[in-house]
Every structure is written in C-alpha cells, then in structure tokens.
Amino acid sequence: MNIKQYLDSTYLKTAEQAGITEEENILVAQEFIQEAIEEHFKLIMIRPNRVSLAKKMINGANSILEIGTVIDFPEGKSAIEEKLKEAVQAIQDGADDLDFVCNYQAFKKGDTDLVKEEILRGTQLGLANNKVVKWIIEVAALSEKEIIQLSSLIKNVIVSNFEQELFSKVFVKSSTGFYTTENNLPNGATVPAIKMMLENASPLPVKAAGGVRTYEEAVAMIQLGVKRIGTSGAKKIANGQNSTNEY
C-alpha cells in the first residue's frame, strides 16, 4: 500500500487561528506545499487564497501534486450563489479538488431542498470543469441518524443526476476539523461515523478528515474503505510516526 496516495496534506489555519502574523502564515503554507511536493503526497489542501501560490510552486517544481481547497469554510451556511462564486474563483486559480462545506445547519433544521440544490449545483460546476468535488458533512455536529440521512441524501442527489462513471469524483467527507465540540469530544473522523458514511454514501467514495494522527489509524481507515485522508500530519503518518497536530 502506498499510503501517500491516500493523504491530502492539509493546512487550513488562518494567521489568527495559528497565532502568527499573515506573513508568517504564508511561510507556513509554503512549507506545507513544499513538503507535499517532496513527499509525493496525493494532494495539498489549502485555503482558497493560497491556491495560486501552490500552483506556482508546483509548476516550478515540475510536480504532479494536486491542489485542493475548501469552499464556504468552515461553517457552510453561505447562500448557494456565494458558494458557487468562491468555487469558480478557486477553479480559475488552479484548484483540482473542491471541498464544499455542506449547509449541515440547514439540513438539521429540515431544509433538505436547499441542501439538495447546493449539492446538485456545486457538483455540476465541479464536474463540468473536470474537478473532484467533496461534500463535508461535519459529523461532530450531527447525530448518528443525521450522519446516515445526510450521507444518503448526497448519494441520492449524485446517483439521480450524474452518470455512473462520475461517481468516483464526488466524495462525502467527514469533517472540517474546525468544529468546536463540548466535553472534548472528537471533532473529526471517528470509526463509527466513517462506517455509517461508508454504508450510506456508497457508491460514492468517502474521505476521513480530522483526528487521524497515526499510521495505524490511517491504515485502519483505509481498510474500512476510505479513499482519502485529510491530515496536517501527513509526513509523520507516512513515516510511521504519530502526529501531534490538531487536524
């Protein structure tokens, strides 16, 4: 198993979140991009305002590293048109993967029509531009029943509206890694949540994000059936070490 081809090396902190200056944060992003190039990871996952920087560095290195970015991150509650506008800009800047935060708050309130529309239109935009699309459902904010229902809803929208050969390009993704939980409960991918996603999103692939910090945990997720893992400790995981990073 080449575990590196499952790893989306991830750096999504703002300068404020990292407790550093904007200039310092750009340097951290550059370090993550350079590391991903050198380590031959599948993809570098960064904020939209860093996509053009990554594209420049990757081209300069003649690398095949892919670029992913997040859309409407981390809360996912912007209007559909705002989401699409941000995605269009990311595509223009050179993103290969678009990780949309699903409006899980609207879903929890019962507004499934809104959620279905954003999934349909966001996926149409991504696939029309030959991009991979991922829908983050934020499992830590959902009950078990809601994880099952939202995974199923996404699956049903895709299966009903797109050709079968495109299913592999639309993922259901567990988490942003930025959701605040109570009582120190996990805010990322857990084995029970991933199992529910795999069972109810199939035939769509699943990405586990947040909380995967060791090589053993990554292998366990892959053995369950996930196709991608998002982590800010990709190099340590690939080298069989434990990551102390939050995501």
Model-derived regions: residue spans:
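Glycine-rich anion/phosphate-binding loops
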Residues: E75-Q89, K109-L120
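Conserved N-terminal beta1-alpha1 strand-loop-helix module at the mouth
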Residues: M1-I80, Q92, L153
